Amino acid sequence: MPSERVAKILEELKALSLLEASELVKAIEETFGVSAAAPAGGMVMAAPVAAAAAAPAAAPEPVEEQTAFDVILEAVPADKKIAILKVVRELTGLGLKDAKDLVEAAPKPVKEGVAKEEANDIKKKLEEAGATVKIK
């Protein structure tokens, strides 16, 4: 059973819109110097999914242009794996093992919640190294 303080924070998180949840993740990353782009990826999506589920219950919001994009590593040719691995390490700051796990587990998100321009730059770098990349 969570403490009263934790329960209150949890209730506030449930009320966040998807955009607010994205802003929260960015603020946490900057404040604590961590990255939400985990190699496993499962827990990263838990908060936005919960926020998305809670959002329809709220009043409809005006349609906004997408401002946060996910860069997905779709495919890695075997002969280009080392070059792609180097680019992934450069872009994400991951260690060798984590970057290798990410590259070998394609399709996987390389970066999540980035601006359109940054997403396009990341896509270009990965494609130049030989990867197949998609932006969502």
Curated annotation (Swiss-Prot):
Signal peptide: none annotated. NCBIfam families: L12 (TIGR00855). Transmembrane segments: none annotated. InterPro entries: Ribosomal_bL12, Ribosomal_bL12_C, Ribosomal_bL12_C/ClpS-like, Ribosomal_bL12_oligo, Ribosomal_bL12_oligo_N_sf. The keyword Nucleotide-binding does not apply. GO terms for cellular component: cytosolic large ribosomal subunit. Homodimer. Part of the ribosomal stalk of the 50S ribosomal subunit. Forms a multimeric L10(L12)X complex, where L10 forms an elongated spine to which 2 to 4 L12 dimers bind in a sequential fashion. Binds GTP-bound translation factors. GO terms for biological process: translation. Forms part of the ribosomal stalk which helps the ribosome interact with GTP-bound translation factors. Is thus essential for accurate translation. Belongs to the bacterial ribosomal protein bL12 family. GO terms for molecular function: mRNA binding; structural constituent of ribosome. The lineage of its organism: Bacteria, Bacillati, Cyanobacteriota, Cyanophyceae, Synechococcales. It comes from Synechococcus sp. (strain JA-2-3B'a(2-13)). It comes from the Bacteria. This is Large ribosomal subunit protein bL12. Keywords: Ribonucleoprotein, Ribosomal protein.
